[in-house]
Amino acid sequence: VTKDGILELEQRRFKAMCDGDADALGALLHNDLTYTHSSGAVDSKESYTRGVREKLWDYQSIKASDATVSVHGGAAVVHCRLRIDVKVGGVPKIVESVALAVWVDDGGWTCIAVHSTPAPK
C-alpha cells in the first residue's frame, strides 16, 4: 500500500464516522481495535461502533492537517492534527487533537489502534 492509499483509508474512516455509518466504519476497523479518545476513555471495536451507531458521538465534521504517514511492511502509522466538530451525548463540542492511527494488513488493511490527545495550545 502507498502513503496516499493509507490517507484515503483515513478519509473513508472519517466519512463513515461523520455519516454515522457504523457498518462502513466497522469494515475499516480491526477486530482487535483499541481506540483511545482525547479524554483518555478507551473503546474496543464493538463499543466504539455501537457508540457511533447510537449517536453517543455524533460527528459533524473531521478536518485533518499536518498528516505524516510511514509504511513498514504490513503496518502503517498516521500522525496528524484533527479538528473535530462532534456532539457528545447531544452536547456540541469542538475537539482539537493530535492523533496517531495504526493500520495493519491482516488480509486487508484495517485500523487496529487510534490514540488521540488534546492538541497543544
PLM features per residue range, with description:
Residues V1-A27, D32-K121:
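A beta-strand edge to alpha-helix "cap/lid" segment located at domain peripheries
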